[in-house]
Amino acid sequence: MAVQQNKKSRSRRDMRRSHDALTTAAVSVDKTSGETHLRHHVTADGYYRGRKVINK
């Protein structure tokens, strides 16, 4: 089992963890239906940028 040779300081530990923060998803509202969706993704009704791109 691996055992550290020297103790890492709180500063080094926190600097390593600085990239671990979570970000919220970029959510947009559709122009036609008012439905929320992820940016650059088609809505559940098949609309993308105000145009119908998928017919069900």
From Swiss-Prot:
Keywords: Ribonucleoprotein, Ribosomal protein. Residues 1-38 are annotated as: Disordered. Pfam families: Ribosomal_L32p (PF01783). Residues 7-16 have a biased composition (Basic residues). GO terms for biological process: translation. InterPro entries: Ribosomal_bL32, Ribosomal_bL32_bact, Ribosomal_zn-bd. GO terms for cellular component: large ribosomal subunit. One of its GO terms (molecular function) is structural constituent of ribosome. HAMAP family: Ribosomal_bL32. Belongs to the bacterial ribosomal protein bL32 family. This is Large ribosomal subunit protein bL32.
